[in-house]
């Protein structure tokens, strides 16, 4: 099992960089890390509140999460956003941790979730957000 504490900033960022460059060992490590994240092994860590004496900032990481899951598991866009909320949230929180973000936020493709119930048809490409 992976230990999320093994990926403090910038270690997690270095792993992401190696994976993006096509390093096969990094891909295997990423797969093990995300297997554990998706299984809920890091949920206790995700529940720890960020220190209140700091200013926290983050970015929308859902697109990087989609890219990772498409590469590692061949999960396509529609399935990523629509089928498993636990996988979606855990993936985003794990990506945040690898990027060195201390306060966890969950972001999503709000435009897709608001336009579809109103009758609009969304286009879900295989590995890009709607």
Located regions from the model:
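Catalytic cores of TIM-barrel enzymes
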Residues: 1-130
